[in-house]
Swiss-Prot record:
InterPro entries: Leu-rich_rpt, LRR_dom_sf, NTF2-like_dom_sf, NTF2_dom, Nuclear_transport_factor_2_euk, NXF_fam, TAP_C_dom, UBA-like_sf. The gene is nxf2. Expressed in female gonads (at protein level). Expressed ubiquitously. Residues 1-285 are annotated as: RNA-binding unit probably involved in Piwi-dependent recruitment and single-stranded RNA-PPNP complex formation. LRR repeats lie at residues 200-221, 224-245, 249-270, 475-496, 500-521, 524-545. The keyword Zinc does not apply. Residues 286-553 are annotated as: Necessary for silencing function. This is Nuclear RNA export factor 2. The lineage of its organism: Eukaryota, Metazoa, Ecdysozoa, Arthropoda, Hexapoda. Changing D837A: Reduces binding to Panx. Residues 325-408 form the RRM domain. It comes from the Eukaryota. Residues 788-841 form the TAP-C domain. In the ovaries, part of a complex composed of at least Panx, nxf2, piwi and Nxt1. The complex is knowns as Panx-induced cotranscriptional silencing (PICTS) complex, Panx-nxf2-dependent TAP/p15 silencing (Pandas complex), SFiNX (silencing factor interacting nuclear export variant) or piwi-Panx-nxf2-p15 (PPNP) complex. Interacts (via TAP-C domain) with Panx (via NIR region); the interaction is direct. Interacts (via NTF2 domain) with Nxt1; the interaction is direct and prevents Nxt1 binding to nucleoporins. Interacts with sbr/Nxf1.
Length: 841
């Protein structure tokens, strides 16, 4: 509200600003402020947009970008920005150079599209007083705090996190954007002048700040950093970027989602930075390549094509015979869904009996999911006429309404052809040495990056299998289809041409019942893997599950890795999971943990699973039957009862005594517990919560408390043998680090809370105790590696150690091709100085 006398109290402890407008002169459409002097007092800038930006996604940002462009790096720190229907206002001070540049442009700013908006300036609207709000002070305070709170990301620590810097709550009364060169310079000066913290810095996260010019970073140059993250900014000029980073060095530079990466001569236009950065967006310079998408350079979604929405659905038949590209535009303002989850929901509405639907060139643009399709008019008509252009989210019964742009582009020679991509991908999936077609996570293949191939569609799955059948009809003996969200496989007849096919792996899919894969029963399969599908939960007992599968596949000899001829009626232990993504967690964590708990030599290694904030409790309600062995059983149970937190049997004032905190204390308690052996066949697992960041795991089953041994003159003597106990363990685990390991796909978990309970086993559990032999993994004889696997091990070992090929082969062969043993052998030899310098490449 310009010219209205008032007092601005920001409530942050600063002295209020009293707007009294002593000078009534308002400058507009002029190039000079005459005999007035801006001085150090507060000035008011008014932007007269007259509502022209009302329907723009972020009018304030559009105006600020135009102002930053006009002042061209001069000091400019707006305060108290106010949006209005016809005009926006802000206060500034100590910015004479910026005001001069605005007058030089006759108090007009140019928007990105070429339009101009007039502004007016009133000088000295309020007198500056000491301790009033000072933008530079607030900025320095936030930067200083962040420098003391450096973060770790992707295994790199010491990173200063300035992502979306202007969103910090301390700036609620300021306009802070690193897209303003003067503010970026101010931030760099604060960092440069902080000698106490500056030398701890290992990199900078400057993403999502609308930065165009990074010249201020020259202040921080001539130091070797690990990371410079500039993603999601407005960097467009390669020449300006290279000049600004001429002396800046870091292991990796991140430029994703900047205009510069969409320029036709990228990355050649930044080649001068090759000696400054090892990686750009995760790739070495020599592996960078232009990822083409017509959505980037050929299609303007605002003007190209004809819009179809719920208001003009009747126009759709006009495009029935069109061979052009059509764009789907699905609004998602908060980017709630990533690409994979979005398509999971979108595909629900497709009609499986109609044309194959291949979304191409998917991108999230502004606030919308966008992709292109062609040659599937019947599916489009179904989505328009039957689904009313609505995408339903089953959880919460939410609806996302969308629209189409038909005929946005003609088909050009260099555009993607989905079926050609599928044929190429299938060819690359065949492993000749093992005669196996590995279609696991088929949609993630590199040659399918521009097309979404969903094997949850029965027709698309049938097409993929028909391609495979024609290509490998006499050679393929096994097909892996795991992790593909397969719902139905009703076209397995196309595999009839594969005369050698004997094994199919359908694990970790979405198959609901055996009728969905009934067509596989016509093939002479000997091995089938189904675990990880919802159909496995349809059976209470393993024997029921095996019997049902054998009715459809009578010739099977192996089911889920279990030999049905040796162990008829038995299958792997059951898992009850709230999310099928937890299968990997259960397999990797639970078995390893219990194996290490069993082994006296390795139990101390459980230290790695706990942190200083971990909590452990133990309870025991084993009821002892009175007989001649009672004293000895009570003696054995005393090791559990000593640490048990049985509140019903103890004084409530000592309730906290049975709660153990911290990894050291917890492992000390675990080491005092007896040696045990778990009956892995008895285990029942329930993952009650899993979200990728943590999980709640409950496991129950049978264990054998092994007897302690005593020595006498006649050899070894034991007391009463092993005691069978029922047990349950509940783990609350969190993932504290991700993207670990050589493949950057490993995660490190920590147990936040654990409860161990000891009780009486059921009569059924005792009767079936240890009836199935689960050998220790360390005792299993490894199968001979194929030549292809050995070659991969040699290459990986060379990459890890840096040895020349002759030494690599020597050490790996000495370790009998066991990669873990080979690494330990290398470390030992290197420590003993047995490897000469000439052995390293």
């Amino acid at each position: 509200m310009p010219n209205q006398m008032r007092v601005l109290d920001f409530g942050d402890g600063s002295v209020p600003i009293q707007l009294d407008y002593p000078d009534s002169k308002i400058f507009s459409k002029c190039s000079s402020y005459g005999d007035r002097v801006p001085g150090t007092h507060w000035n008011e800038i008014t932007v007269h947009h007259k509502g022209r930006l009302e329907y723009s996604p972020n009018p304030e940002q559009i105006i600020l970008d135009a102002l930053y462009q006009a002042i061209d790096g001069a000091d400019f720190f707006p305060v108290f920005y106010q949006r209005g229907k016809n005009m926006d206002t802000m206060l500034v001070r100590n910015c004479k150079a910026a005001i001069d540049k605005l007058f030089k442009q006759r108090l007009s700013i140019n928007l990105k599209g070429g339009a101009s908006i007039p502004i007016s300036i009133q000088l000295g609207v309020a007198q500056y007083q000491r301790h009033q709000i000072t933008p530079t002070f607030h900025i320095a305070r936030v930067v200083t705090r962040l420098m003391k709170q450096l973060i770790q990301r992707d295994g790199v620590d010491g990173l200063l996190n300035l992502d979306n810097f202007g969103s910090h709550p301390e700036f609620k009364n300021l306009v802070v954007s690193l897209g303003n060169p003067s503010i970026l310079m101010n931030v760099c000066q604060v960092i440069h002048n902080d000698d106490n913290e500056r030398f701890r810095l290992n990199g900078f996260i400057l993403s999502n700040n609308r930065i165009r010019d990074i010249r201020p970073l020259t202040l921080l140059a001539n130091v070797d950093y690990a990371l410079l993250d500039l993603r999601g900014n407005k960097i467009k000029s390669a020449e300006r970027l290279c000049r600004a980073l001429e002396q800046f060095r870091a292991r990796e530079l991140l430029l994703e989602n900047n205009p510069i990466v969409k320029i036709s001569n990228f990355p050649a236009n930044i080649k001068s930075l090759e000696s400054n950065f090892e990686l750009v967006d995760g790739k070495p310079f020599n592996m960078l390549h232009k990822i083409f998408s017509p959505l980037d350079v050929e299609i303007d979604l605002e003007v190209d094509g004809a819009r179809i929405d719920t208001n003009n659905m009747w126009k759709l038949p006009e495009f029935e015979n069109s061979q052009h590209w059509h764009a789907f535009m699905i609004p998602d303002p908060s980017h709630e869904f990533n690409q994979e989850v979005f398509f999971d929901f979108f595909f629900i509405r497709l009609d499986p009996t109609l044309s194959n639907f291949y979304p191409c060139y998917y991108k999230y643009i502004n606030t919308e999911h966008v992709f292109l399709v062609r040659n599937c008019f019947d599916q489009i008509a179904h989505l328009v006429n039957n689904c009313n252009l609505e995408m339903t989210i089953p959880t919460g019964d939410r609806i996302f309404r969308y629209y189409l742009r038909m005929n946005v582009s003609t088909v050009k020679q260099h555009h993607v052809d989905p079926e050609e991509c599928i044929q190429k991908a299938v060819s690359q999936c065949y492993v000749a040495q093992n005669r196996m077609l590995n279609l696991e996570r088929f949609h993630s293949r590199e040659c399918l990056k521009d097309v979404m191939v969903s094997l949850s569609s029965p027709k698309i799955l049938t097409y993929v299998l028909s391609v495979a059948s024609r290509k490998f009809m006499t050679t393929c003996s096994e097909i892996r289809l795991c992790h593909n969200k397969v719902l139905v496989l009703d076209g397995a007849h196309v595999l009839g041409m594969m005369g050698c096919l004997r094994a199919v792996d359908l694990s970790h899919n979405w198959v609901q019942d055996l009728s969905s894969i009934h067509s596989l029963g016509n093939l002479p399969l000997k091995s089938l893997v189904l675990h990880g599908n919802k159909l496995c939960r349809n059976y209470r007992l393993p024997s029921e599950y095996v019997r049902a599968v054998k009715e459809v596949f009578p010739q099977l000899t192996t089911l889920d890795g279990v030999d049905l001829q040796t162990n008829p009626g038995q299958s792997l232990q059951k898992n009850f999971l709230c999310d099928t993504g937890a299968y990997e967690l259960v397999g990797a964590f639970l078995e390893n943990y219990l194996r290490e708990f069993e082994n006296d030599e390795f139990r101390h290694n459980l230290y790695k699973y706990y942190s200083e904030n971990s909590i452990f409790t133990l309870t025991c309600n084993y009821n002892v039957v009175q007989n001649h062995q009672t004293p000895k059983i009570l003696q054995r149970l005393s090791k559990y009862n000593r640490h048990a937190r049985n509140l019903r049997n103890k004084d409530y004032s000592k309730a906290s005594d049975g709660v153990f905190f911290g990894c050291t204390y917890i492992v000390e308690i675990l080491l005092q517990l007896p040696r045990v052996t778990h009956d892995f066949h008895s285990l029942q697992t329930d993952v009650m919560h899993y979200n990728g960041k943590g999980a709640v795991i409950y496991v129950a089953g049978l264990l054998r408390d092994e007897p302690p041994s005593t020595r006498n003159g006649h050899g070894s003597k034991t007391d009463i043998g092993g005691v069978l106990l029922g047990f349950s363990r509940q783990f609350v685990v969190t993932f504290d680090e991700a993207n670990l390991g050589l493949g950057k796909r490993a995660r490190r978990l920590k147990i936040a809370n654990e409860r161990l309970h000891i009780t009486n086993p059921s009569k059924t559990a005792i009767r079936n105790a240890f009836s199935v032999n689960f050998p220790d993994p360390s005792e299993r004889q490894a199968e001979e590696d194929s030549l292809d696997v050995k070659d991969h091990k040699l290459l990986l070992f060379q990459e890890v150690t840096g040895l020349i090929s002759t030494w690599v082969t020597s050490i790996v062969e000495e370790a009998d091709w066991d990669f873990e043993r080979a690494l330990k052998l290398f470390i030992q030899k290197n420590a003993d100085h047995e490897i000469p310098d000439l052995a390293f490449a």
